[in-house]
Amino acid sequence: MLVPIVVEQTGRGERSYDIYSRLLKDRIIFLGGGIDDNVANLVIAQLLFLEAEDPDKDIHLYINSPGGVVTAGMAIYDTMRYIKAPVSTICVGQAASMGAFLLSGGEKGKRYSLVNSRIMIHQPLGGFQGQATDIHIHAKEILRMKDQLNALLAEHTGQSVEKVAADTERDYFMSGEEAKNYGIIDAIVTRNVVTGGAN
């Protein structure tokens, strides 16, 4: 994929940035595509950079993701919680699986969705081959992760752990309005105007 270049005029001449670097100047991080260790490392590095620049200023994390590796997503989530700078989350397109989890983990009151975005939650997926004992070990670990994710999602949404566990048994799709009612987001945004929530 070709990344667009933005050229800016400064007092000292022209300066060119790739589009993501230019967005970073405005404290915007874009999480697009599947979440793996490489993507997580890039997002974490940007979060830490913006935290070092100004720990009191909001960071805006735009999410358009089908989800991905649980441990990679948890690394981003833990960094969001670790830094002092508030992280606002905005769903554009879709936030599914780990993408929806990260969306819900944004700063309370600053979790948004665009009008036609869709949000989907479900239980963690896993696959493992090998000896029966190793398969058993991995099955226990994925069940532990499932319980951990359900508890955190319940904490962020205000739903009971039992409801979250039941809803995540299968793919559970929501519109922006449904995600707001569920507690994953706080408001829906249209044309830079927040609707259906505080702000």
From Swiss-Prot:
EC number: 3.4.21.92
GO BP annotation list: protein quality control for misfolded or incompletely synthesized proteins
GO MF term list: ATP-dependent peptidase activity; ATPase binding; serine-type endopeptidase activity
Range of residues in the leader sequence: none
PROSITE patterns (UniProt xref): CLP_PROTEASE_SER
Top-level taxon: Bacteria
Family: Belongs to the peptidase S14 family.
Name listed for the protein in its UniProt record: ATP-dependent Clp protease proteolytic subunit
Gene from which the chain derives: clpP
